């Protein structure tokens, strides 16, 4: 799709690798960067929407439903993962941070707004 000039939407990219494996599991960030470069070259998303939520709010939400394999991790793991995303966001202008601690309808509206703004800029550019 990219080669044909199309758009690709992903729910995860290498930012998740840095956050979960690098920060969460404390793997070597430099080695992850080498792998990222080797696998994807200079390919990066044009925009990244990061839905940020405080670890305590996330824990409350997780407790209200069935957990998956990642959600059984300890709180300190998620604190490190969140910091990984926030660090990546501070290093890359493509990040749009959305406060996912807000009610669902507000988060959805913010996602729609950021996506619409990006599409308008892309069509002008």
Q: Could you describe each region identified by the protein language model?
A:
Residues 1:
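N-terminal phosphate/diphosphate-binding loop that engages ATP/GTP or pyrophosphate donors
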Residues 4-7:
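Loop/turn-to-beta-strand initiation segments
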Residues 12, 17-83:
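A glycine- and Lys/Arg-enriched "phosphate-lid" helix/loop adjacent to the NTP-binding pocket
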